[in-house]
């Protein structure tokens, strides 16, 4: 089976690849940028589900176009195997902030027109934007959401070309990690809002996700929960 990750986010790709390393079946995992030129995908949906769907459709359509053209044999052979395209959209939701950052998690500082020029990268700007919003209400309950959209092409379809998108079924999986956000950053691991989020599960020391090592984080994360459902479904189908 070939799995194509519909993401150009290196942090997410690394997490997905680590989670898929111990899959019992033989699986080849590619970031879509290993097969295609990366391109901008408009994430203008109103929910994590809509954004994940936009991503999986965009990457599938690009792969479909590639499958119709003359290409190298090693690329053509990918389409002769069971093929899964996995897209994910995720974010942090804080109920006291009306669910924000939510679907704007990756661009929260920009969404809030927060002065971000003084920060070294987008993650840092987003963190300080959230800290600013939490000034009078942290610690407070919060949760991470990961939504996965899956397109799976069965082996008998895979004859060097792919079927049109209209013939594909998109399936959905969601994982949630409950916890709370605090008003100080702790830890140097992970990415995104990990330094502010304390998960409620398997965390007797009240560590932030940024204080977990990757292997420990990947046993409880929202992304792991959604991906586990997706992988179980893939092996049911294959």
Curated annotation (Swiss-Prot):
Q: Which residues bind Mg(2+)?
A: 89
One Gene Ontology biological process: purine nucleoside triphosphate catabolic process
The active site consists of: 89
Question: What is the free-text note on the cofactor?
Answer: Binds 1 Mg(2+) ion per subunit.
| Gene Ontology molecular function, alphabetical | dITP diphosphatase activity; ITP diphosphatase activity; metal ion binding; nucleotide binding; ribonucleoside triphosphate phosphatase activity; XTP diphosphatase activity
Keywords, A to Z, come to: Hydrolase, Magnesium, Metal-binding, Nucleotide metabolism, Nucleotide-binding
Q: What is its EC number?
A: 3.6.1.66
Query: What is the required cofactor set for this protein?
Result: Mg(2+)
User: What are its GO cellular component terms?
Assistant: cytosol
Quickly give the catalysed reaction.
XTP + H2O = XMP + diphosphate + H(+); dITP + H2O = dIMP + diphosphate + H(+); ITP + H2O = IMP + diphosphate + H(+)
Binding-site positions, substrate: 7-12, 90, 191-194, 217, 222-223
Describe the subunit structure: Homodimer.
* Known role: Pyrophosphatase that catalyzes the hydrolysis of nucleoside triphosphates to their monophosphate derivatives, with a high preference for the non-canonical purine nucleotides XTP (xanthosine triphosphate), dITP (deoxyinosine triphosphate) and ITP. Seems to function as a house-cleaning enzyme that removes non-canonical purine nucleotides from the nucleotide pool, thus preventing their incorporation into DNA/RNA and avoiding chromosomal lesions.
Protein family according to the UniProt entry = Belongs to the HAM1 NTPase family.
Give the protein's recorded name.
dITP/XTP pyrophosphatase
Annotated organism of origin: Helicobacter hepaticus (strain ATCC 51449 / 3B1)
Source taxonomy lineage?
Bacteria, Pseudomonadati, Campylobacterota, Epsilonproteobacteria, Campylobacterales
